[in-house]
């Protein structure tokens, strides 16, 4: 059993170690654990301030600036403006300096799934067939790739994001900020049910009323029926560390035997889910395709709608009136259409084909109507997330600047009151910043080339750039 180092634990350091590393020996019931802990040594030449000069600065919300500069002090953006207007106190301080062609906020993907499933399975059975340890290993790689590709934040809407976020936050692995729902909530015979397996098998693993001794209840799905079960389901996700609650409010594509046009959960169940989430200062994100599910989710008070395939003018006006975020997830549809449904069971492929055109029309209509939109792909960490920017422009009808706003400034709205102060290059915001060698306003597909992302700062720390190792470490000393 591996445990974190406690401050009271005796420390033993090897004075001859060339790694400058402190070790902790901690006994437990299984073994004597030898753990490495970075030795932090104060340095008089340590950079206190980072100054980035940019030929073009895209703020996330607002017009781009030419010949601009941005100053990071610790983790916070301290100055944004003309290169000529940098306060002298920053120029006099100890600093690291970078000059880049294009600077902008780090990207968000607002609809991810931290499943880490085995590719051998092509339906929901993979969630039960894959060991969580294997899932975690795959997710660690994907999170590293995400940061290298310029994605500094993910919203996970069904998966192990709560658990992976802890490993990222304590520095065990490298990845974006992760804001997770924990398990997605589904009714029996709903979008989160696994129709290929016996009901007892599914409920025994994912049923909210069936926790086993020693079981964390930390799967990607949670089956609940009735107001008391859904109330408990919300509380269990918050116990895991969920920053948002995800509910399956209509049938879906990947669930083999349900109908995307039909609403799921009763109005009373949806109301309790929203109320219980609000009690803990969380919003609810609803998976919806058909209008019945869309309207039920809106009436219940859900603040983020996913897919929204059969939306119309009535829906768009209600979303604007109530300040509801629209996350279309066009990428997953385009990917399956291009591959002729490769990887889908026949029932899912038929459903996707049936709703693909309506989904696109709804997306285009929402953009024209002025609904607030954030971008999400419905894929996994490290996947082709930048495709969503391309489809927002080429299929949805956004301008490149609008697509960037949807992937940056609008994105924190997807976690409601739990949102960090990020997504924009503004003074006082967290320094989640990326640099590009090409102008995305001229070619939105530039985000699809990882080499085009030359620098990545997350929370003010440089994770990708000259002199930085592949895991965000100082290449001169990988343990600092």
Curated annotation (Swiss-Prot):
Q: Which cofactors does it use?
A: Zn(2+)
A biological process term (GO) from this entry: proteolysis
- CDD domains linked: Met_dep_hydrolase_A
Q: According to the UniProt entry, what is the EC number of this protein?
A: 3.4.17.-
Biotech use, in short, is: Detoxification of contaminated food is a challenging health issue and ochratoxinase is a promising enzyme that hydrolyzes ochrtoxin A, a mycotoxin demonstrated to have nephrotoxic, immunotoxic, genotoxic, neurotoxic, and teratogenic properties; and that occurs in a wide range of agricultural products.
Q: Please provide, in alphabetical order, the Gene Ontology terms of the cellular component aspect for this entry.
A: extracellular region
GO MF terms here are:
carboxypeptidase activity; hydrolase activity, acting on carbon-nitrogen (but not peptide) bonds; metal ion binding; metallopeptidase activity
Spell out the temperature dependence recorded for this entry: Optimum temperature is 66 degrees Celsius.
Q: How does activity depend on pH?
A: Optimum pH is 6.
Keywords noted in UniProt: Carboxypeptidase, Hydrolase, Metal-binding, Metalloprotease, Protease, Secreted, Zinc
Where is it predominantly found?
Answer: secreted
Q: Where does Zn(2+) 2 bind?
A: 246, 287, 307
Q: State the active site.
A: 246, 378
Query: Which Pfam families does this entry report, sorted A to Z?
Result: Amidohydro_1
Catalytic activity field: ochratoxin A + H2O = ochratoxin alpha + L-phenylalanine
Compartments annotated for it: namely: Secreted
Q: What is known of its domains?
A: Each subunit of the homooctameric enzyme folds into a two-domain structure characteristic of a metal dependent amidohydrolase, with a twisted TIM (triosephosphateisomerase)-barrel and a smaller beta-sandwich domain.
Briefly state the protein's biological role. Answer: Carboxypeptidase that catalyzes the release of a C-terminal amino acid with specific catalytic activity for aromatic amino acids such as phenylalanine. Is able to degrade ochratoxin A, one of the five major mycotoxins most harmful to humans and animals that is produced by Aspergillus and Penicillium species and occurs in a wide range of agricultural products.
Membership in a protein family: Belongs to the metallo-dependent hydrolases superfamily. Ochratoxinase amidase 2 family.
Name of the protein described by the UniProt record: Ochratoxinase
Organism from which the protein derives: Aspergillus niger (strain ATCC 1015 / CBS 113.46 / FGSC A1144 / LSHB Ac4 / NCTC 3858a / NRRL 328 / USDA 3528.7)
């Amino acid at each position: 059993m591996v445990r974190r180092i406690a401050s009271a634990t005796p420390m033993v350091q090897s004075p001859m170690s060339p790694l400058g590393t402190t070790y902790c020996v901690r006994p437990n019931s299984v073994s004597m654990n030898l753990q490495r802990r970075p030795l932090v040594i104060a340095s008089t030449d340590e950079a206190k301030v980072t100054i980035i000069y940019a030929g073009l600065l895209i703020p996330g919300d607002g017009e781009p600036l030419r010949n601009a500069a941005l100053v990071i002090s610790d983790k916070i953006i301290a100055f944004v403006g003309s290169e000529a207007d940098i306060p002298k106190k920053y120029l006099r301080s100890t600093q690291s300096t970078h000059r880049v062609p294009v600077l902008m906020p780090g990207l968000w993907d607002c609809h991810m799934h931290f499943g880490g499933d085995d590719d051998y399975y092509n339906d929901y059975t993979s969630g039960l067939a894959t060991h969580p340890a294997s899932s975690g290993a795959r997710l660690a790689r994907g999170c590293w790739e995400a940061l290298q590709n310029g994605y500094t934040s993910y919203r996970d809407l069904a998966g192990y994001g709560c658990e992976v976020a802890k490993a990222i936050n304590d520095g065990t692995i490298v990845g974006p900020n992760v804001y997770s729902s924990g398990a997605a909530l589904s009714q029996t015979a709903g979008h989160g049910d696994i129709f290929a397996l016996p009901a007892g098998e599914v409920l025994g693993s994912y049923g909210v009323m069936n926790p086993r001794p020693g079981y964390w209840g930390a799967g990607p799905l949670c089956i609940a029926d009735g107001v008391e079960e859904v109330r408990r389901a919300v509380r269990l996700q918050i116990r895991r560390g969920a920053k948002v609650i995800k509910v399956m409010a209509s049938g879906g594509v990947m669930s083999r035997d349900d109908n995307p046009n039909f609403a799921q959960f009763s109005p009373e169940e949806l109301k309790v889910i929203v109320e219980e989430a609000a009690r803990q200062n969380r919003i609810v994100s609803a998976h919806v395709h058909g209008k019945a599910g869309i309207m039920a989710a809106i009436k219940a008070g859900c603040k983020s709608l996913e897919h929204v395939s059969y939306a119309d003018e009535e829906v768009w006006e209600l979303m604007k009136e109530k300040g509801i975020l629209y996350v279309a997830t066009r990428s997953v549809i385009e990917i399956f259409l291009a591959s002729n449904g490769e990887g889908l069971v026949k029932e899912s492929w038929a459903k996707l084909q049936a709703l693909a055109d309506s989904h696109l029309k709804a997306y285009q209509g929402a953009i024209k109507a002025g609904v607030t939109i954030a971008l999400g792909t419905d894929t996994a960490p490290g996947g082709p997330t930048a495709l969503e920017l391309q489809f927002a422009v080429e299929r949805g009808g956004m301008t490149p600047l609008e697509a960037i706003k949807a992937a940056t400034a609008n994105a924190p709205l997807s976690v409601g009151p739990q949102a960090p102060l990020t997504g924009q290059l503004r003074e006082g915001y967290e320094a989640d910043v990326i640099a590009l060698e090409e102008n995305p306003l001229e070619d939105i597909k530039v985000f699809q080339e990882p080499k085009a992302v030359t620098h990545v700062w997350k929370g003010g720390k440089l994770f990708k750039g000259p002199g930085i190792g592949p895991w965000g470490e100082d290449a001169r000393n990988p343990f600092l």
